[in-house]
Amino acid sequence: MRTLWIMAVLLVGVEGHLLQFRKMIKKMTGKEPIVSYAFYGCYCGKGGRGKPKDATDRCCFVHDCCYEKVTGCDPKWDYYTYSLENGDIVCGGDNPCTKVVCECDKAAAICFRDNLKTYKKRYMTFPDIFCTDPTEKC
């Protein structure tokens, strides 16, 4: 299912903040997010179940949990404002909802950066049918 979602995003073009999130990840990690994170582990990309496979996958789990707390806007499609100041992501704007979304994305991008040393290529295209452990709660 998450493969279809990612392909749909690629075919229609990235709108809203997904492009912003991609840029944040690229800036923090130097990796191309669609290749490196879109199908990583059990939680990166669309959906998620089971137990995160490693620290990078846990970044995605925490990001999903962060999005679950967002109310009043659509975390995947609404634009937010951010800037880079001395290499740091600074979320801005007057809309409290989109600012929270930006903070969720910022935390995930930093988490990916902080866990680059434990990133495992074997989880890059991990089939979600192997995510069979009990699903953790946020």
UniProtKB/Swiss-Prot annotation:
Pfam family, one: Phospholip_A2_1
Catalyzed chemical reaction(s): a 1,2-diacyl-sn-glycero-3-phosphocholine + H2O = a 1-acyl-sn-glycero-3-phosphocholine + a fatty acid + H(+)
Protein name, per record: Basic phospholipase A2 PL-Y
Protein purpose: Snake venom phospholipase A2 (PLA2) that can cleave arachidonate at the sn-2 position from phospholipides in the micellar state or in bilayer membranes. PLA2 catalyzes the calcium-dependent hydrolysis of the 2-acyl groups in 3-sn-phosphoglycerides.
Catalytic residues (positions): H63, D105
Tissue: Expressed by the venom gland.
GO biological process: arachidonate secretion; lipid catabolic process; negative regulation of T cell proliferation; phospholipid metabolic process
GO molecular function: calcium ion binding; calcium-dependent phospholipase A2 activity; phospholipid binding; toxin activity
